[in-house]
Amino acid sequence: MKQTLVKISFITVASVFSLSSYAQLKAGEVDASYKPVFDGNVLSMVLEPDGKNVCAGSFYNVGDRKICGLIRLKANGDEDESFNKGGKGFDSYATAVARTSDGKYLVAGHFTTYNEKAVGSLVRINADGTLDETFKNDIKFEIVNHKNIKEIELQQIVMLPNGQFYVAGCFNRVNGKLAPLIARFNADGTRDESFLPTDKEIHLKSSPNVDAIWKAPDGSLYLGGSFGGYDGGFKQKRLIHINADGTLDRSFHQPQLDGFVKSISPFGEDKILVGGDFLTTESGDRFLTCVINKDGSLDESYNPRQNFFTENHEAESLAVFGSKLVGDNVIIVGGDVVTPGNAFFHVLTKDGKDFSSTLKIEGQPNKIVSFLKIDDSEKYAYISGFFTKVGDYVLPYFARVALRDIVPDGINATNINKVGPSVRYNNGMLTVNGIEGNAELSVYSTKGTAITLCNVSNALPIALPLPKGIYIVQIKNANGKTYT
């Protein structure tokens, strides 16, 4: 193991500030070591059980590799070079990715080739990154008979337990047959034509796009977007509910949002958290986010203030692109679509009426955040957008932020301020106090590099001059007990 040792000295310290020394990252802190270096946005993401991540987006290079639209990252953010080894990926951006039960990946996007082989805009990729040619890769999506829109966009993929899946976006035909905004497919890629929530065309003056979808535990679907004319008229707009049997829930009360929906996520039982660029609802002002009850009515208890998002009263160009309830906190990301430098990544209380006192994001992105993904354990928040920095760290387009204190893998952490020696940091000096008798002191970087290895036998504080950073400190006493 490479060792970079520093001289230690013994001093008496009157008082220092407490440090959570056992945490590799503190809650709210950006993980500067997680740095894949994309040259474009991540638009969709699958979090693997082994800690790896599959990212789809509008990137053409990741690090030193020329790869378009789809890549798999290791748990530390490095590229998984075994995935699509030697391949170039798509010829254009990918908008959505989902993992099948057997470990393959469904990918949708604006592409026409994968590894230089002609494909449709929906493909299935094997676990090793190669094209699954057993899947029906020639599905044809279209937008026809519409006044202004000619080009399709596939925005969302939602898996079902039986292997079927939904695709939603900007289209109204699949293989020449009616499919307004959403279609259901069998596992082999053939369309399940029994799923047709409406037999009516999207209204010609509607903006026909689904930007957000959430599948409820009962199997029903909530769809949000810019559409203003689902089911042929203007009553079903911005946010709709599709029953588990595939029928349109026409009893779902329309909240009358004055803008578009860009994110939907669960908010406890029988409620959803909705984000977008709306400013009002039929029940009054709701700035960029609101909570909707199961029947479509507005939850009056959630009501965030405008200054949580911006100090600028000209708020028409602001939008929330991602929102999620995590414990008793609401995480929101977004910014100004006209002035990208006006961005936010905030944590509100559950009622939206104040900033959280239990979780604060330490560094703000320098440009708009357009994507949010939180792992199932609520350990990390992954964000993407137009930013190149988060706080003081250069992190182009993609970053990871800790939502709770993170302890290095393989370390059994103990809060040594309470049960043994104490470790504190102040003014460039790491001090260790409370050692009794003979002990072994080790200080490592988070990558495992030894910075200090020594035997000590002094009751006075041990002082190590170290630059500000994250360190792993281990103290093994004469009885063989180790504090980390």
Where are these regions (language model features)?
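C-terminal outer-membrane/trafficking sorting elements
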Residues: 414-484
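Extracytoplasmic mature domains of secreted or surface-exposed proteins
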Residues: 21-412
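Short, surface-exposed loop and linker segments with low hydrophobicity and enrichment for Pro/Ser/Thr
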Residues: 9, 227, 258, 425-426, ...
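A generic structural signal for short, solvent-exposed coil/turn residues
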Residues: 13-17, 99, 157, 213-215, ...
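Bacterial Sec-dependent N-terminal signal peptides
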Residues: 1-25
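A generic "functional-site adjacency" signal
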Residues: 6, 17, 27-28, 233, ...
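Serine/threonine-rich, low-complexity intrinsically disordered segments
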Residues: 6, 13-14, 102, 351, ...
